[in-house]
């Protein structure tokens, strides 16, 4: 796709291996991962600064795992409230669904409240670790073009000056109104909700009760959410005929807040803003050297808090693949797996978010009556009720095609699903989360066995070239047995017995775990070599040192 570009030579030219348009959370996450992989990145943002008002309020365990992968989770956690429940209330205040999953299979609380601007700031400051990563604010993309080996962007600077960026790849993280997506003429099909909502953020929380409450009031549904650092968010449906200007008037604001506060005049307003809830999905996530991520690729209603988290999944999925391609360690075909893996799951999360919105504010009054009746019925069906309250209805990603080997496995297979992250014990005696051992790249994890056994030198070299770590998991009581040490293999103790249980459940011995922590393949020691060869070919990995391809590692 080529847009028209002027012939006048601009004053300033920038180069980078990857250009990212948009300094929101998805763009910042992409830049952090690529930065730690040594890739030169230029982030282009049309605003003068990061957005400093609260937007998304829910961050899940998968997103925290992405933060952990780029070394920022300890700075993010102080801006979160873990184990944040979501409670649906009838118009009379009865709680008919108390959703508070207490599982931590990925190492973190499954539902967390957070303050997005402060977490965005953590990611932005994280870029200072990488001298080859730069951000340009107050730059608007006016046009761009791509060839077989590069992308060129024309920018307009803060004082009207013209600049160009030449990059090998472009990632569009420029939001739901993405200029990049529109210029590429990629359809963005979906629906816009007929009703808007007004969001009101208040400092020094005047309510101060924990968790999130969604009141299914047919007159005016509303949401009340406790956020970190003493912030309270209220959301009220905007009724037909009302405008943002009208609702922002003091007497109307007082009327809204009187539904939820005894003294609506004693509040410290941070801001109010009217939102329209959209549910849209891009037809394609990639055209040649341009890729879409986050809201540029999909937008969804807020009711499951998955817009932000879906964007983080995009970034985590795409960043490691792009890093391998840019560094010459994999072919460009690897990037085709990004859409294969992410688009269907994004669609599932959109559908879930729309459904949750219908539970809160049914389009028809009779549907609300049916909802309330079903909520009573669930009390007599404990297994069904637990299914909802533990959020097992949330579509967990399971990739069935892409950068993995399914081998015809069904839904019960862990291939294409995220690997667990329990605590493990190091040989030093320190207890850490598993990802601290895995690092930022691939890991080949074996239960009770040395995963290098039976691999030839060429296979080991090929995978070490992309940073793989070989990890042997043993019962914690065996961690100090030095005779079992294998050169080049890290040993960890199974502190909580979770890894043994995982391998036993799936009747396997070795898991190949990708940088985004998804299982790419399973094997036993005698089949690992063949699996790695097949996976490398599917991912179009570059060939490693094969000089000793027939030499076995004992």
UniProtKB/Swiss-Prot annotation:
Under which EC number(s) is this enzyme classified? 1.14.13.127
Which superkingdom, per the lineage?
Bacteria
Q: Which family does it belong to?
A: Belongs to the PheA/TfdB FAD monooxygenase family.
Protein keywords:
Aromatic hydrocarbons catabolism, FAD, Flavoprotein, NAD, Oxidoreductase
What residues does FAD bind to?
A: 17-46, 285-295
Spell out the protein name for this chain.
Answer: 3-(3-hydroxy-phenyl)propionate/3-hydroxycinnamic acid hydroxylase
Q: Name the pathway.
A: Aromatic compound metabolism; 3-phenylpropanoate degradation
Would you indicate the residue range of the signal peptide? Answer: none
Q: Does the keyword 4Fe-4S apply?
A: no
Reactions catalysed, as given in the entry: 3-(3-hydroxyphenyl)propanoate + NADH + O2 + H(+) = 3-(2,3-dihydroxyphenyl)propanoate + NAD(+) + H2O; (2E)-3-(3-hydroxyphenyl)prop-2-enoate + NADH + O2 + H(+) = (2E)-3-(2,3-dihydroxyphenyl)prop-2-enoate + NAD(+) + H2O
Q: Name one Pfam family in it.
A: FAD_binding_3
Kindly give the HAMAP family that the UniProt entry links to this protein: MhpA
Q: What does this protein do?
A: Catalyzes the insertion of one atom of molecular oxygen into position 2 of the phenyl ring of 3-(3-hydroxyphenyl)propionate (3-HPP) and hydroxycinnamic acid (3HCI).
* Gene Ontology molecular function, alphabetical: 3-(3-hydroxyphenyl)propionate hydroxylase activity; FAD binding
């Amino acid at each position: 796709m080529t847009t028209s570009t002027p012939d006048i030579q601009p004053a300033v030219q920038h180069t980078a291996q990857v250009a990212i348009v948009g300094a929101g959370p998805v763009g910042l996450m992409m830049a952090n991962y690529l930065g730690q992989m040594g890739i030169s990145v230029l982030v282009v943002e049309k605003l003068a600064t990061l957005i400093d008002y609260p937007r998304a309020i829910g961050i899940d365990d998968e997103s925290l795992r992405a933060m952990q992968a780029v070394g920022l989770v300890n700075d993010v956690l102080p801006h979160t409230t873990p184990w944040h429940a979501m409670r649906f209330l009838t118009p009379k205040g009865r709680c008919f669904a108390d959703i508070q999953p207490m599982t931590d299979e990925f190492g973190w609380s499954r539902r967390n409240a957070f303050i997005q601007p402060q977490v965005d700031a953590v990611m932005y400051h994280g870029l200072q670790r990488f001298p080859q990563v730069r951000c340009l604010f107050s730059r608007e993309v006016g046009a761009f073009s791509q060839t077989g080996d590069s992308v060129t962007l024309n920018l307009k600077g803060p004082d009207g000056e013209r600049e160009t960026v030449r990059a090998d790849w472009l990632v569009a993280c420029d939001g739901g109104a993405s200029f990049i997506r529109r210029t590429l003429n990629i359809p963005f099909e979906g629906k816009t909700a007929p009703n808007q909502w007004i969001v009101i953020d208040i400092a020094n929380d005047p309510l101060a009760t924990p968790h999130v409450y969604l009141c299914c009031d047919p007159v005016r549904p509303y949401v009340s959410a406790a956020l970190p650092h003493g912030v309270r968010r209220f959301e009220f449906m905007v009724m037909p005929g009302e405008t943002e200007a009208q609702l922002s008037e003091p007497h109307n604001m007082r009327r809204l807040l009187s539904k939820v506060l005894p003294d609506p005049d004693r509040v410290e307003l941070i801001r109010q803003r009217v939102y329209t809830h959209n549910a849209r999905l891009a037809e394609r996530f990639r055209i040649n050297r341009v890729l879409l991520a986050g809201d540029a690729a999909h937008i969804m209603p807020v009711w499951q808090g998955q817009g932000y988290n879906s964007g983080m999944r995009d970034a985590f999925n795409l960043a490691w693949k792009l890093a391998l391609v840019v560094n010459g360690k994999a072919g460009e075909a690897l990037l085709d797996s990004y859409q294969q893996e992410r688009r269907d799951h994004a669609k599932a999360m959109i559908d879930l978010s729309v459904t949750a919105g219908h539970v809160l504010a049914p389009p028809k009054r009779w549907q609300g009556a049916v909802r309330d009746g079903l909520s009573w019925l669930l009390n007599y069906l404990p297994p069904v009720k637990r299914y909802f309250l533990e959020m097992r209805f949330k579509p967990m990603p399971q990739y069935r095609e892409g950068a993995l080997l399914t081998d015809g496995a069904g839904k019960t297979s862990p291939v294409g699903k995220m690997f667990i992250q329990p605590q493990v014990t190091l040989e030093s005696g320190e207890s850490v989360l598993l990802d601290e051992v895995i690092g930022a790249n691939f890991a080949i994890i074996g239960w009770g066995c040395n995963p290098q056994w039976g691999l030839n030198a060429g296979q080991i070299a090929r995978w070490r070239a992309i940073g793989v770590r070989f990890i042997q998991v043993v019962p914690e009581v065996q961690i100090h047995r030095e005779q079992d040490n294998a050169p080049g293999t890290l040993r960890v103790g199974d502190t909580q017995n979770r890894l043994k249980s995982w391998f036993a459940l799936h009747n396997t011995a070795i898991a190949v775990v990708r940088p985004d922590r998804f299982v790419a393949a399973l094997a036993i020691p005698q089949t690992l070599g063949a699996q790695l060869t097949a996976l490398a070919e599917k991912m179009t990995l570059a060939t490693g040192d094969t000089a000793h391809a027939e030499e076995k590692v004992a």
